[in-house]
Swiss-Prot record:
Family: Belongs to the class-I aminoacyl-tRNA synthetase family. IleS type 1 subfamily.
Binding site for ATP: 646
PANTHER family: ISOLEUCINE--TRNA LIGASE, MITOCHONDRIAL (PTHR42765:SF1), SOLEUCYL-TRNA SYNTHETASE (PTHR42765)
Protein source organism: Bartonella henselae (strain ATCC 49882 / DSM 28221 / CCUG 30454 / Houston 1)
Protein name per UniProt: Isoleucine--tRNA ligase
Binding of L-isoleucyl-5'-AMP, residues: 602
Matching InterPro entries: aa-tRNA-synth_I_CS, aa-tRNA-synth_Ia, Anticodon_Ile_BEm, Ile-tRNA-ligase, Ile-tRNA-ligase_type1, Ile-tRNA_ligase, M/V/L/I-tRNA-synth_anticd-bd, Rossmann-like_a/b/a_fold
E.C. no: 6.1.1.5
Catalysed reactions, as listed in the record: tRNA(Ile) + L-isoleucine + ATP = L-isoleucyl-tRNA(Ile) + AMP + diphosphate
Motif ('KMSKS' region) on chain: 643-647
GO CC annotations, alphabetized: cytosol
């Protein structure tokens, strides 16, 4: 029987973990305390001072609009950028983050107009610069709000000196960049069909468009043949199909494809109230004739094939010919590559006033059309407010009752479709009609449908020779080929957009923004006068772009040329030009940033937005890209993969996540996503991240508690036990992985590796094995000191590696360990000694862990069957027939590795009742209860408990530890 020592409380003789680092993080409150500490200690200024002599690393911030609280997309974007900035700052670079805001444009202007409408005010009654001042104040308010929201996410940056596109200097530089385009003849005035918002009375860029389902009228229309080489075509009709009946008055041609098979068909029977009658001859693509016949309830007979050659000489009449004395123009047949057999009739209604492809094919054939005596001019059938003009006879101001409207001020469809359809029925030119639900472009701000309309605008040419044999398009495509893209698919995506895009529509008919500050004559010729430009730029620098709209601005800027017939352009610049020019007034103007930027990082929608406008602006003025790399992230969906929407009630608000869980939980979610794809977020997903966070935090907490007993002793590498060398080898591997992944912006790879390492290799393996030695060994134990040294290395390296990702938690942990330190964020990633890399040792331990896995499996079964409580109650026999595994275990205390009180290794084939695992050949375990007595201090079962009479209830090892502690006065 073991005698119990009643005089010693053994729990107080153990080196148990001691720390004030709580298990429950309380992040929402703790993060605020850390932010206050950073602010008081001037952490941002210290980061800049520390890095002032290092090489620069520049991430240029794509500016969000200053018009509301941040949403989940903003939060995702800023966290990803913050991780990049912090990771380069901690790896030897001067990485300064300068946040920016896009302040001009329709979103902000729309908000002020909404306020006016609520007050019963009319925007047109307010002086322009007074309105602009309200827009400026609105933007400044939201810059302040968003700054605090970004900082609450843990984002570190120069929030006291951000860039804004409405700053006077920025407006001056934007104007200067515009002048460079003007002076190099890249800007011209022209008329083209542009996307037009009737509700907002302005042209829109592709990036300002979103697509929603919309139900439209669809019609099939008969165009009578006017001229043909073949007599049997003279009384025939070419049938087109369109989803925009209101554009029929603007028709100038019908397009076909020489690659499609067409025939002439005769109507044999008809069951309809209007449309084709028996005996009529109609032209269709053969692949589409059946669907067309069914729609019009016809039985058709194929007469013959129509050759592509016949179409070249075919001329049609307008289906509304004679209406209100108009539409007497000849309708040409044009061979177009955009014509397909996917829907319709195989013939495409072509209205160059209302479609990009229509416009392009019309211009391509312009010389031939004029040779044929066809008027090639393009009409303006619809005005700014969506009303028909005089170019649409019978529907415009000549109509009794006034002009008909296509879309009204509320974005509702007007009577245009109905009136055009009625006119076609009256003219016996309607083949069939219907309704179609399809994806249709809407303004991203008003959410209302837009139209394509021909309107005079200012453009930047994509294909003008720039004097060196290049064009803006070719320069941009070359720059793309020299740019790194993450993911790599972004390169082809941006290149295809640049290759296919039309000229850049610069002008907007709005009030809030940088004006197109040029003077031009009636023919659109731009004044090129350096003195005039200099006066404009000086005024903008001192007063902002409001100077352009001040009374007497024309005379002020033209000076001695004011008597000449130059017209002041009052259109506003496309806001994408503003942000696209930001590289000029941010990267080029600040000493702490580089031009070109190392990286631009935004959502994948910015291939058609900021990435593109920045590229074109820079290539047009500097012949190269303003960035070396482009990274994109996807969009955040709900847990079911649906787009977040207020109407669906499935939005996740970043402020609520922070309030409930803390910013580091949100950041952890970001770090565990494939951010370059669309991600999912919701309560269950967040809870999964909370669970992962707790495991990581507990590992850090255990290390902090253990290191409370660390006296900083260093043991040479060669004197370390093999297990410690293995962990150092793993740290060397992780160091390579972490650095490479930070370079590759693969944050998920880092987080997954470090989570797996902390849970699988540390908590469940290394820490578990070494707890006995760390808690129970004598103070002089080299094994214990070696383990403390390695735990110290693990802690410092892991906390520093994770600091860019989880800045609050890692700061809290670092300050718990080093309370006199200023911040973990002032630390640098540490180099790894070459001697830590030990592949042969790692290979040996793979084999050791295979055997351990079988032992652990056997003990888990024993525990489940309640034959043992703790693994220390076991002393299993391990049978090993595999000589390679047996060799790996030589000179190794497997009982310590398997956390048993004893363990016997036997050579030979395992008995039939031994525990085995199918994936570990040649190993079997026979469970056996440990012999001896349970040590009251370590709880191990040994034969030497009671060998020391002073401590009769502990093992010899523990008795020696107690005597040593007694000598040191610790008990």
């Amino acid at each position: 029987m073991t005698v119990k020592n009643e005089t010693v409380d053994y729990s107080k003789t153990l080196y148990l973990p001691q720390t004030n680092f709580p298990m429950r993080a309380g992040l929402p409150q703790k993060e605020l305390e850390l932010m206050e500490r950073w602010e008081k200690r001037g952490l941002y200024a210290q980061l800049r001072q520390q890095a002032k002599d290092r090489p620069l690393y520049t991430l240029h911030d794509g500016p969000p609009y200053a018009n509301g609280h941040i949403h989940i997309g903003h939060a995702l974007n800023k966290v990803l950028k913050d991780v990049i900035i912090r990771s380069f700052q901690m790896r030897g670079f001067n990485a300064n983050y300068v946040p920016g805001w896009d302040c001009h444009g329709l979103p902000i202007e729309w908000k002020i107009e909404e306020k006016y409408r609520a007050q019963g005010k009319n925007k047109d009654d307010v002086p322009l610069n007074e309105f602009r001042q309200e827009c400026r104040q609105f933007a400044q308010h939201w810059i302040t709000v968003q700054s605090e929201e970004f900082k609450r996410l843990g984002v570190v940056g120069d929030f006291n000196r951000p860039y804004t596109t409405m700053a006077f200097h920025a407006e001056a530089r934007i104007a200067s960049e515009l002048m460079k385009f003007a002076l190099s003849d890249q800007i011209y005035r022209g008329s083209k069909p542009v996307m037009w918002s009737v509700v907002e009375r302005t042209a829109l860029a592709e990036a300002e468009i979103e697509y929603h389902d919309h139900e439209s009228d669809v019609i099939w229309v008969k165009f009578p043949v006017l001229q043909a080489d073949s007599k049997d075509l003279y009384d025939a009709y070419v049938v087109i199909w369109t989803t925009t009946p209101w554009t029929i008055p603007a028709n100038r041609a019908v397009s076909y494809s020489s690659q499609i098979s067409y025939s002439i068909y005769e109507v044999k029977s008809a069951e309809n109230d209007f449309g084709p009658q028996v005996g009529e001859k109609l032209l269709f693509a053969d692949a589409l004739v059946m669907s067309c016949a069914e729609k019009a309830k016809l039985v058709l007979k194929r007469l013959r094939v129509i050759s592509a050659k016949e179409f070249k000489t075919l001329v049609l009449s307008h289906p509304l010919k004679g209406l209100a004395g108009g539409y007497n123009n000849k309708i040409a047949m044009l061979d177009g590559s955009h014509v397909t057999e996917s829907a319709g009739t195989g013939f495409v209604h072509t209205a160059p006033s209302h479609g990009r492809e229509d416009f392009e094919i019309w211009n391509a054939y312009k010389p031939l059309l004029e040779q044929s005596g066809i008027d090639s001019s393009i009409p303006f059938p619809v005005d700014d407010a969506g009303f028909y003009t005089k170019d649409a006879p019978g529907f415009g101001p000549d109509r009794k009752g006034g002009a008909i409207r296509v879309i009204d001020d509320n974005g509702k469809m007007g009577d245009a479709n109905k009136e055009v359809i009625n006119a076609l029925i009256k003219a016996d030119r309607l083949f069939a009609r219907g309704r179609l639900k399809h994806s249709y472009p809407h303004s991203w701000r008003s959410k209302k449908p837009i139209i394509f309309r021909n309107t005079p605008q200012w453009f930047i040419s994509m294909d003008k020779d720039l004097g060196d044999g290049s064009t803006l398009r070719s320069r941009a495509l070359k720059a793309i080929s020299m740019t790194r893209f993450v993911p790599s698919s972004g390169q082809n995506r941006l290149a295809s957009m640049i290759a296919d895009r039309p000229d850049w529509v610069l002008s907007r008919q709005r009030a809030w923004g940088v004006p197109i500050c040029i003077f031009a004559n009636e023919d659109g010729v731009i004044l090129k006068d350096e003195r005039v430009n200099e006066r404009i730029l000086r005024a903008f620098e001192a007063e902002g772009a409001d100077a352009w709209f001040a009374e007497g601005a024309r005379e002020r800027f033209l000076g001695e040329r004011a008597h000449e017939s130059w017209i002041q352009v009052v259109d506003i610049l496309d806001v994408w030009f503003d942000s696209g020019a930001s590289h000029s007034f941010v990267l080029e103007d600040r000493d702490d940033l580089n031009w070109p930027a190392d990286v631009y990082f935004e959502g994948s929608d910015q291939h058609r937005g900021w990435f593109q406008s920045s590229l074109l602006e820079s290539c047009g003025t500097r012949a190269c890209s303003p960035y070396k790399a482009v990274i994109t992230h996807g969009f955040t969906l709900d847990e079911n993969g649906k787009k977040m929407s207020k109407s669906l009630g499935n939005t996740v608000v970043p402020q609520e996540i922070i309030k409930t869980f803390g910013a580091d939980i949100f950041r952890l979610w970001v770090m565990t996503t494939d951010y370059w794809e669309d991600q999912r977020l919701g309560k269950q997903i967040l809870q999964t991240n909370v669970d992962s966070y707790r495991k990581l935090r507990n590992a850090i907490r255990w290390m902090l508690g253990t290191l409370a007993h660390d006296e900083g002793e260093e043991i040479s590498y060669c004197a370390l036990p093999d297990l410690e060398k293995l962990i150092l080898h793993r740290l060397s591997e992780l160091d390579q992985l972490v650095n490479r992944a930070y370079d590759d912006f693969d944050f998920k790879k880092i987080m997954r590796a470090l989570l797996d390492f902390s849970i699988t290799e540390l908590s469940a393996f290394y820490f578990d094995i070494r707890k006995d030695s760390l808690y129970c060994d004598p103070p002089s134990s080299k094994k214990r000191k070696a383990s403390l040294q390695v735990v110290r290395e693990i802690f410092e390296r892991m906390v520093i590696w994770l600091a860019p990702m989880l800045p609050f938690t890692m700061e809290e942990a670092w300050l718990e360990r080093y309370p006199e330190s200023t911040s973990v964020h002032l630390e640098q990633f540490r180099p790894v000694p070459m001697e830590w890399q030990n592949e042969s040792l790692a290979e040996r331990w793979k084999k050791i862990r295979q055997v351990r896995k079988v032992v652990t499996g056997a003990l888990e079964l024993e525990r489940a069957d309640k034959r043992i409580g703790s693994s220390l109650e076991a002393a299993p026999i391990v049978f090993i027939s595999n000589p390679v595994l047996r060799e790996a275990l030589e000179n190794l205390d497997m009982a310590e590795i398997c956390i048993t009180s004893a363990l016997t290794i036997t050579q030979g084939v395992p008995p039939s009742d031994a525990f085995i695992l199918s994936d570990v050949e040649g190993v079997g375990v026979y469970p056996r209860k440990a012999l001896g007595t349970k040590c009251a201090r370590s709880w191990r079962y040994t034969q030497d408990v009671g060998s020391d009479p002073t401590y009769p209830d502990v093992s010899a090892r523990d008795a020696a530890a107690l005597r040593e502690l007694q000598v040191l006065g610790k008990i």
